[in-house]
């Protein structure tokens, strides 16, 4: 069976990379030069936030005669590089990058080939054929903080996502700004870093419980974190919402089915998918690219359910305090 010497293979791939060559797997696209494929990159398909985006994006794509090529990076740079090569091999017409913080430098291969891109909360100077969906985190978080203040909560904790993510930092900053707007004293001890998982929510809430004065309300950077907080509350026999008010973020599908139903901040996955697809389609159809790119705004809204209640007592002193 014929084989290629490893040294020769390495030299060939080096030349391929230097020339920027990627094989066309679409059979020359039947003379049209168009693949009618959009790429979709998400962070973690196991996170309940993302399947809804994938589903809606694909539904809209089918309606417009497009296919999608989807990949998940799990916040891994090497997986992102592999994903980009795969997308280029398939001659995608555009890519929606729904990673909420992946380094844009890794996407330079797509930019230099004038492949239309759409990001969420992108930073940096505007560029042609690069659209940005800016999330208005402040709107929904402000509503949630004002709601808790109206319920007489004065010690409101905030559990962030991984602060390596721009979106997590933006949500934390929105929380701080919202507390300042209503004149609430900010206690930095009440801001804990999480990792957007139930386990991370449990661990962060355990640290809050160890404080001399516990919070009476917890606002979480996503719903999965809030679910972890509620589970830890159950284990510690802290009743939600009687003893602790909890608010999530994202409004994932099953947030209304947990007990008690979770009050949360809605960031519509369906609308995010719709905006992302429309941004790519607009760029594909546009003969002259917008030199400054295009920005779209996605608003957030507070959704009231049953996980918050009036604070009938002062902040509880921790039984674990020394």
Where do the PLM segments sit?
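Flexible loop/turn connectors
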Residues: 205-321
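Central regulatory/effector-binding core of bacterial HTH transcription factors
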Residues: 59-108, 116
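Flexible loop/hinge segments that line or gate small-molecule binding clefts
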Residues: 75, 98-143, 164, 184, ...
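An alpha-beta-alpha
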Residues: 144-182, 189, 292-307
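Interdomain hinge and pocket-entrance segments immediately C-terminal to HTH DNA-binding domains
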Residues: 23, 32-46, 60, 64-66
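Short, solvent-exposed amphipathic alpha-helices that sit
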Residues: 11, 48-63, 140-147, 166-185, ...
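N-terminal helix-turn-helix DNA-binding module of bacterial transcription factors
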Residues: 1-36, 321-322
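Hydrophobic alpha-helical segments within soluble ligand-binding/sensing domains
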Residues: 133-158, 173, 177, 198-207, ...
